[in-house]
């Protein structure tokens, strides 16, 4: 079988790649990328998986579908490429980080430093048509990302951070006897004041990792990401 992800995720998801729904999704995407503008760029679709191998995942921050503006999405939930303005939801995540763990603000939204430590930045849908939120829902991505969540749950000792209703709906896939689940409203400007601010997900994540005798996450991002492209 063709290699889609260049680490242990390939083996974990190989059964999914062989199923009819994935073949249909592949055909749909070929057509979409050929005829319209789709984000992220094709080579970035599986970036979250490439950055954080299966056996290294400690934390999952679950997003919905990718940012649908130009130059924003690069395959990782909430993250944007260097040089791109920090989107409103991520600004609110940074505000909560400041009050929760004393995060020093940065002027970029490139979250690779988290991914490198085992924070899996997964969207439930991995592509989107430009300017059309949710336009690639129900095409097969959910089945694939559900399989990824279920595999991590089975492996155990993962903190799942679920913000907003569509992320919370994935709770049913998670075995809470051997994993931890933290939920709050979505950090978008519309919802953040209704329970996102003050939810302390970052310090709670690290408390849980310490209980499992795992190294906590250093949530501080580097001030300069020009070197990390």
Curated annotation (Swiss-Prot):
Molecular function, one GO term: uracil DNA N-glycosylase activity
Family classification: Belongs to the uracil-DNA glycosylase (UDG) superfamily. UNG family.
BP GO terms, sorted: base-excision repair, AP site formation via deaminated base removal
General function of this protein: Excises uracil residues from the DNA which can arise as a result of misincorporation of dUMP residues by DNA polymerase or due to deamination of cytosine.
SUPFAM superfamilies reported for this sequence: Uracil-DNA glycosylase-like
Localisation: Cytoplasm
Source superkingdom: Bacteria
Record flagged with keyword Disulfide bond: no
Main location: cytoplasm
Active-site residues per Swiss-Prot or TrEMBL entry: 65 (proton acceptor)
Assigned EC number: 3.2.2.27
Keywords: Cytoplasm, DNA damage, DNA repair, Hydrolase
Catalysed conversion reaction: Hydrolyzes single-stranded DNA or mismatched double-stranded DNA and polynucleotides, releasing free uracil
One cellular component term from this protein's GO annotations in UniProt: cytoplasm
Keyword Cytoplasm: yes
NCBIfam families per UniProt: PRK05254.1-1, PRK05254.1-2, PRK05254.1-4, PRK05254.1-5, ung
Matching Pfam families: UDG
Coiled-coil stretches noted in the UniProt entry, renumbered to this chain: none
Entry-linked CDD domains: UDG-F1-like
Name under which the protein is recorded: Uracil-DNA glycosylase
SMART domains, per the entry: UDG, UreE_C
